[in-house]
Design a protein with these regions (language model features):
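N-terminal membrane-targeting hydrophobic helices
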Residues: 1-244
Length: 244
Protein backbone atom coordinates (compact mmCIF):
# COMPACT_ATOMS: atom_id res chain seq x y z
CA UNK A 1 0.00 0.00 0.00
CA UNK A 2 1.24 3.55 -0.66
CA UNK A 3 2.72 5.57 2.19
CA UNK A 4 -0.07 7.12 4.28
CA UNK A 5 1.13 10.69 3.80
CA UNK A 6 1.00 10.29 0.01
CA UNK A 7 -2.75 9.59 -0.02
CA UNK A 8 -3.86 13.26 0.21
CA UNK A 9 -2.55 13.61 -3.35
CA UNK A 10 -5.84 12.07 -4.48
CA UNK A 11 -7.92 14.89 -2.98
CA UNK A 12 -5.79 18.05 -2.76
CA UNK A 13 -7.22 19.47 -5.97
CA UNK A 14 -10.80 19.14 -4.71
CA UNK A 15 -10.35 22.23 -2.53
CA UNK A 16 -13.58 24.17 -3.01
CA UNK A 17 -16.73 25.19 -1.15
CA UNK A 18 -18.52 21.92 -1.90
CA UNK A 19 -16.14 19.99 0.33
CA UNK A 20 -14.59 20.35 3.75
CA UNK A 21 -10.90 20.33 2.87
CA UNK A 22 -9.75 19.20 6.32
CA UNK A 23 -12.13 16.24 6.12
CA UNK A 24 -10.91 15.35 2.63
CA UNK A 25 -7.28 15.28 3.76
CA UNK A 26 -7.93 13.36 6.98
CA UNK A 27 -10.34 11.00 5.23
CA UNK A 28 -7.77 10.18 2.56
CA UNK A 29 -5.44 8.92 5.30
CA UNK A 30 -8.06 7.60 7.73
CA UNK A 31 -8.10 3.91 6.68
CA UNK A 32 -4.49 3.72 7.94
CA UNK A 33 -5.26 5.34 11.31
CA UNK A 34 -5.74 1.92 12.89
CA UNK A 35 -2.04 1.28 12.26
CA UNK A 36 -1.14 4.27 14.41
CA UNK A 37 -3.48 3.12 17.16
CA UNK A 38 -1.75 -0.27 17.09
CA UNK A 39 1.73 1.30 16.71
CA UNK A 40 2.34 -1.08 13.81
CA UNK A 41 0.93 -1.66 10.31
CA UNK A 42 -1.59 -4.19 11.54
CA UNK A 43 -5.39 -4.25 11.33
CA UNK A 44 -7.83 -3.93 8.47
CA UNK A 45 -10.91 -2.39 10.14
CA UNK A 46 -10.12 1.05 8.76
CA UNK A 47 -10.37 -0.27 5.20
CA UNK A 48 -13.86 -1.73 5.72
CA UNK A 49 -17.23 0.01 5.37
CA UNK A 50 -18.02 -0.59 9.06
CA UNK A 51 -14.66 0.88 10.00
CA UNK A 52 -15.39 3.99 7.95
CA UNK A 53 -18.16 4.90 10.38
CA UNK A 54 -17.18 3.46 13.77
CA UNK A 55 -13.45 4.23 13.62
CA UNK A 56 -12.31 6.49 10.78
CA UNK A 57 -15.03 9.13 10.91
CA UNK A 58 -14.84 9.72 14.70
CA UNK A 59 -11.04 9.95 14.43
CA UNK A 60 -11.32 12.45 11.56
CA UNK A 61 -13.57 14.68 13.68
CA UNK A 62 -11.27 14.37 16.71
CA UNK A 63 -8.09 15.05 14.76
CA UNK A 64 -9.66 17.99 12.93
CA UNK A 65 -10.59 19.53 16.28
CA UNK A 66 -7.13 18.91 17.75
CA UNK A 67 -5.31 20.22 14.68
CA UNK A 68 -7.25 23.44 14.24
CA UNK A 69 -7.61 24.31 17.92
CA UNK A 70 -4.23 23.27 19.32
CA UNK A 71 -1.67 22.40 16.66
CA UNK A 72 -2.11 24.58 13.56
CA UNK A 73 -1.22 28.03 14.86
CA UNK A 74 1.84 27.03 16.97
CA UNK A 75 3.08 24.69 14.22
CA UNK A 76 2.98 27.37 11.53
CA UNK A 77 4.54 30.05 13.74
CA UNK A 78 7.42 27.71 14.63
CA UNK A 79 8.23 26.75 11.04
CA UNK A 80 11.62 27.93 9.75
CA UNK A 81 11.66 31.13 7.74
CA UNK A 82 10.29 31.85 5.21
CA UNK A 83 7.76 29.04 5.71
CA UNK A 84 6.31 30.65 8.84
CA UNK A 85 5.56 33.76 6.79
CA UNK A 86 4.33 31.94 3.70
CA UNK A 87 1.70 29.99 5.60
CA UNK A 88 1.00 32.50 8.36
CA UNK A 89 -2.31 33.51 6.80
CA UNK A 90 -3.64 30.00 7.44
CA UNK A 91 -3.46 30.57 11.19
CA UNK A 92 -6.52 32.80 11.05
CA UNK A 93 -8.68 30.41 9.04
CA UNK A 94 -11.56 29.27 11.21
CA UNK A 95 -12.77 25.70 11.54
CA UNK A 96 -15.92 24.43 13.16
CA UNK A 97 -19.01 22.30 12.71
CA UNK A 98 -21.60 24.84 13.77
CA UNK A 99 -24.56 23.62 11.73
CA UNK A 100 -26.03 20.41 10.39
CA UNK A 101 -25.00 21.47 6.90
CA UNK A 102 -21.36 21.79 7.97
CA UNK A 103 -21.55 18.39 9.69
CA UNK A 104 -22.99 16.75 6.58
CA UNK A 105 -20.35 18.35 4.34
CA UNK A 106 -17.62 17.17 6.72
CA UNK A 107 -18.99 13.62 6.73
CA UNK A 108 -19.30 13.18 2.96
CA UNK A 109 -15.93 14.86 2.40
CA UNK A 110 -14.25 12.48 4.86
CA UNK A 111 -15.99 9.47 3.32
CA UNK A 112 -14.90 10.54 -0.17
CA UNK A 113 -11.33 10.75 1.08
CA UNK A 114 -11.60 7.23 2.53
CA UNK A 115 -12.95 5.88 -0.75
CA UNK A 116 -9.99 7.32 -2.69
CA UNK A 117 -7.65 5.64 -0.19
CA UNK A 118 -9.23 2.20 -0.58
CA UNK A 119 -9.38 2.51 -4.36
CA UNK A 120 -5.70 3.44 -4.49
CA UNK A 121 -4.79 0.54 -2.21
CA UNK A 122 -6.82 -1.74 -4.45
CA UNK A 123 -4.15 -1.39 -7.15
CA UNK A 124 -1.13 -1.65 -4.85
CA UNK A 125 -1.72 -4.46 -2.31
CA UNK A 126 -1.73 -8.19 -2.97
CA UNK A 127 -5.19 -8.51 -1.40
CA UNK A 128 -6.50 -5.39 -3.15
CA UNK A 129 -9.65 -5.70 -5.26
CA UNK A 130 -8.01 -4.72 -8.54
CA UNK A 131 -4.88 -6.80 -7.90
CA UNK A 132 -7.09 -9.86 -7.35
CA UNK A 133 -9.12 -9.22 -10.50
CA UNK A 134 -6.51 -7.88 -12.92
CA UNK A 135 -4.05 -10.63 -13.80
CA UNK A 136 -1.21 -8.49 -15.14
CA UNK A 137 -0.91 -6.63 -11.82
CA UNK A 138 0.19 -9.94 -10.26
CA UNK A 139 2.85 -10.58 -12.86
CA UNK A 140 6.53 -10.00 -12.20
CA UNK A 141 8.88 -7.82 -14.20
CA UNK A 142 12.64 -7.49 -14.10
CA UNK A 143 14.02 -4.16 -12.91
CA UNK A 144 17.52 -2.79 -12.31
CA UNK A 145 20.08 -5.38 -11.26
CA UNK A 146 18.00 -8.26 -12.54
CA UNK A 147 15.66 -8.13 -9.55
CA UNK A 148 12.08 -9.28 -10.02
CA UNK A 149 9.16 -7.33 -8.61
CA UNK A 150 5.40 -7.70 -8.82
CA UNK A 151 3.79 -5.03 -10.97
CA UNK A 152 1.42 -4.06 -8.15
CA UNK A 153 4.46 -3.48 -5.92
CA UNK A 154 6.03 -1.31 -8.59
CA UNK A 155 2.76 0.62 -8.84
CA UNK A 156 2.80 1.00 -5.06
CA UNK A 157 6.28 2.48 -4.86
CA UNK A 158 5.92 4.62 -7.98
CA UNK A 159 2.54 6.03 -6.95
CA UNK A 160 3.89 6.80 -3.47
CA UNK A 161 6.69 8.91 -4.94
CA UNK A 162 4.29 10.64 -7.33
CA UNK A 163 1.82 11.22 -4.49
CA UNK A 164 4.44 12.81 -2.25
CA UNK A 165 5.55 15.07 -5.12
CA UNK A 166 1.94 16.15 -5.73
CA UNK A 167 1.44 16.93 -2.03
CA UNK A 168 4.66 18.96 -1.91
CA UNK A 169 3.68 20.81 -5.09
CA UNK A 170 0.28 21.62 -3.60
CA UNK A 171 1.89 22.91 -0.40
CA UNK A 172 4.21 25.07 -2.51
CA UNK A 173 1.27 26.52 -4.44
CA UNK A 174 -0.62 27.09 -1.17
CA UNK A 175 2.02 29.52 0.10
CA UNK A 176 1.51 33.28 0.11
CA UNK A 177 4.94 34.56 -0.90
CA UNK A 178 3.67 38.15 -1.00
CA UNK A 179 3.01 38.24 2.72
CA UNK A 180 5.11 40.86 4.45
CA UNK A 181 3.57 40.62 7.92
CA UNK A 182 5.38 38.35 10.35
CA UNK A 183 2.44 36.35 11.63
CA UNK A 184 3.36 35.79 15.27
CA UNK A 185 7.02 35.38 14.33
CA UNK A 186 8.95 33.31 16.85
CA UNK A 187 12.58 33.77 17.83
CA UNK A 188 15.26 31.22 17.04
CA UNK A 189 15.22 30.18 20.70
CA UNK A 190 11.47 29.57 20.67
CA UNK A 191 11.70 27.48 17.51
CA UNK A 192 14.66 25.53 18.89
CA UNK A 193 12.76 24.65 22.07
CA UNK A 194 9.68 23.66 20.06
CA UNK A 195 11.75 21.40 17.79
CA UNK A 196 13.63 19.95 20.77
CA UNK A 197 10.36 18.98 22.47
CA UNK A 198 9.20 17.25 19.29
CA UNK A 199 12.48 15.37 18.82
CA UNK A 200 12.79 14.25 22.45
CA UNK A 201 9.16 13.14 22.57
CA UNK A 202 9.54 11.21 19.31
CA UNK A 203 12.63 9.42 20.64
CA UNK A 204 10.90 8.54 23.92
CA UNK A 205 7.85 7.17 22.09
CA UNK A 206 10.06 5.20 19.71
CA UNK A 207 12.13 3.65 22.52
CA UNK A 208 9.07 2.84 24.64
CA UNK A 209 7.27 1.23 21.72
CA UNK A 210 10.33 -0.91 20.99
CA UNK A 211 10.63 -2.01 24.63
CA UNK A 212 6.91 -2.82 24.88
CA UNK A 213 6.85 -4.82 21.64
CA UNK A 214 9.94 -6.78 22.69
CA UNK A 215 8.42 -7.42 26.12
CA UNK A 216 5.24 -8.73 24.47
CA UNK A 217 7.33 -10.81 22.03
CA UNK A 218 5.78 -9.01 19.06
CA UNK A 219 8.09 -8.77 16.01
CA UNK A 220 9.46 -5.26 15.53
CA UNK A 221 10.22 -4.45 11.91
CA UNK A 222 10.59 -1.43 9.67
CA UNK A 223 6.82 -0.95 9.60
CA UNK A 224 6.72 -0.64 13.39
CA UNK A 225 9.62 1.80 13.26
CA UNK A 226 7.91 4.06 10.71
CA UNK A 227 4.52 4.02 12.45
CA UNK A 228 6.02 4.60 15.90
CA UNK A 229 8.16 7.46 14.56
CA UNK A 230 5.15 9.21 13.04
CA UNK A 231 3.22 8.68 16.28
CA UNK A 232 6.09 10.14 18.26
CA UNK A 233 6.37 13.20 16.02
CA UNK A 234 2.62 13.83 16.22
CA UNK A 235 2.57 13.48 20.01
CA UNK A 236 5.64 15.72 20.22
CA UNK A 237 4.01 18.40 18.06
CA UNK A 238 0.89 18.27 20.22
CA UNK A 239 2.90 18.62 23.45
CA UNK A 240 5.08 21.38 21.99
CA UNK A 241 1.94 23.27 20.99
CA UNK A 242 1.20 23.95 24.66
CA UNK A 243 4.58 25.45 25.47
CA UNK A 244 4.52 29.10 26.49
Amino acid sequence: MPFTLAHPAAVVFLKNKKFNFTALILGSMAPDFIYFLNFRPYGNLGHQILGFFILNLPLCILLAYIFHNFIKSPLISHLPRPLDNWYGYLRTEQFGLHSWKEVIVFIYSALLGMITHVLWDGFTHKTGFFVRHITWLRQKIIIFGGEEIYIYKLVQHTSTVIGIIIVLFFLYKLRDSNTRILWGHKSFKDKFIYDLIVIITAIIVLVLSYIIFKYLSIPYGIGNLVVSSINGIFIGILIASFKK
